[in-house]
Amino acid sequence: MKIIHLQKTERTNMFYITYYAKKHNKFITRKGQYDKPDGTKGKSFISKNGTPCLVYWDLDNEGWRMATGEAKVRT
């Protein structure tokens, strides 16, 4: 599944996202949500080189993360 813009109803709900992390050189799964709890918005976009990207709030580490490329999102 490619990263796509999340619907408004999905933006505040918790989800699990699995994607290949170059930093860790393996597939990782994180618990996150689209927006930060204080209301700061996450975003999804296509990079200049055509790679889909999703910036989301990591609920376990309480920080922003960016998933790039193919990702699987489940609620």
Q: What are these regions, as identified by a protein language model?
A:
Residues Y19-Y20, F45, Y56-W57:
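Hydrophobic beta-strand positions
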Residues K8-Y16, K48-L54:
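A short, compositionally biased
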Residues M1-Q7:
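Mixed-charge, Lys/Arg-rich low-complexity intrinsically disordered regions
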Residues N49-T75:
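Acidic, low-complexity intrinsically disordered segments
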